[in-house]
Amino acid sequence: LCIDAASDWALTCVEQLPHQNHHVLIDYGAADGGTAVGLWNQVLDHLHTHQPHAHLTLIGNDLPSNDNVALAANLALQIPRPPKPTVLVSARSFYEPTTAPGTVSFGFSATAMHWLSQSPGPLPRHTHVLASGDAEALERFTAQAMQDWTAILELRSRELQVGGRLLTVNLSRDEEGRYLGHNGGKTRNVHDQLHQIWRELADEGAISEEQYRNGTVLNFYKSPEEFMAPLKDPTSAPYRHGLRLVDERTVHVSCPYRKRWNDDGNTAAFAAGLMATIRSWSRHSFASSAGDAAADAVFQRLEQRIADAPSEWSLDYVEHHQMMERVA
């Protein structure tokens, strides 16, 4: 759903690329690439329609620890279709260079760049900084997030060719302070629920106090102004390398699991599905601190909480879409 909501801007980006013999397109932080197959079908078709003689290369990027075999397989689904692109995997962090300078025509990233490159320090009384109420920690996490974002944009500005476009779809924080897991109080704050379960495990002695303190979700949902800031600062590295803001918007996407539950009333399926998607992005934070058994306990209890009060749960998305161009 998050990727689908950005498909119109992705098509606009490739439609406006300069005509040339070869284009490189890259998906940064692609995971296994499965959710983006449809988007890349559209993008490649659209670019091929506008530039039928250009050869297209599609690169999927993610960490070396990613399931890059699955990523390669999903990229390969594009090969039999016109325009029969070359497909490659770049198994590096997007906090590093991923291609040669000045080679990328269109860069895209969806729901990946909210993860921090390193810990900004302890979060002693919660598992997520935005739900913690800890002003000092918020200042540290914000500084790290902005340092990381500026570094990411500098790297992408170097990789883009002049006239190339970059489209980022990032989990965000809107003007009312809503973000993934917090929809303004319409339902429970997911991050508070995770923290309550984590605190329970510590109180029961299942994890130590040190493990409790280390169980921090190391991501940060930036505001639109924070996303745009490096592109409004002429002294920033991405700005000096020619990266400019073309357009931006905030998009809200309602929880698909909650919608399905509203329609069919299947509480067990709702609890299992919602738990699984929350687990997909938060489990590592708990397992790396206290091991697999403790992490498994978190999500067993989470699923039970959802099943006990399904009307009080919904994982609604707040996304920021940012379209950029390298002009020089």
Predicted regions and their residues:
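N-terminal charged/capping segments associated with class I S-adenosyl-L-methionine
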Residues: L1-V87, A91-G102, W115-G133, T168-E176, ...
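Substrate-binding/catalytic lobe of Class I Rossmann-like enzymes that use SAM or dcSAM, i.e.
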Residues: V162-G291
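C-terminal target-recognition/interaction regions appended to catalytic cores
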Residues: N262, T267-A328
